[in-house]
Design a protein with these regions (language model features):
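Acyl-group handoff/entry surfaces in thioester-processing enzymes
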Residues: 1-32, 46-141, 147-149, 156-170
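Short, charged/polar, Gly/Pro-enriched secondary-structure boundary elements
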Residues: 31-39
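Helicase-core coupling region on the C-terminal RecA-like lobe
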Residues: 43
């Protein structure tokens, strides 16, 4: 059920299947929505505290693992079985294909897809906006009063400078 819901998410959002060229004419392309690789770590035979420690260590390692922008995938998925009734789904995505705001939306959609499949039905979700449509909307917004208001807001937010961020690099 989980793999089916995750595959449904990848099918809905082409950006999650994106790859980037090394300098050819085409800068970005989409891989077909096939071949979901959900890694499974079964730590249910361990003490719960040790399983939690392994999860923390594995998540830290996951954060340090770079993405291959050319060959992908730019989204990695794995499931840790901590106890027979407690699991952790770990989703790591490159910021080029999923930012913090869209990640929240994806989790909500995944929940809807999972629950629908669990009930034996189809999820009722609005059509997903393609990256191309999103870029078109941004282009239409250029110069609008809404865009100008947003620009004024962010200039005010960072009038004293933006804080330095420590981000892992690829």
């Amino acid at each position: 059920v989980l793999e089916s819901a995750l595959l449904g998410l990848l099918q809905r959002h082409a950006a999650l299947r994106s790859r980037f060229s090394e300098g050819g004419e085409k800068q970005i392309y989409e891989a077909p929505p096939t071949g979901l690789k959900l890694r499974l770590e079964d730590w249910s035979g361990l003490e719960e505290s040790e399983a939690a420690e392994r999860l923390a260590a594995a998540c830290a390692e996951e954060q340090r693992t770079p993405f291959d922008l050319v060959h992908g995938p730019l989204v990695r998925l794995w499931l840790a079985v901590l106890t027979p009734v407690k699991h952790a789904l770990v989703i790591t995505a490159h910021h080029l294909v999923c930012d913090g705001w869209s990640f929240g939306m994806l989790i909500a959609e995944l929940s809807t897809l999972y629950n629908a499949r669990l009930a034996g039905g189809e999820a009722k979700l609005p059509p997903a906006m393609s990256f191309r449509d999103y870029a078109h909307e941004l282009q239409k917004m250029q110069g609008s009063s809404e865009q100008q208001s947003a620009e004024v807001y962010w200039i005010e937010q960072f009038k004293d400078g933006a804080p330095a961020l420590e981000l892992p690099t690829d």
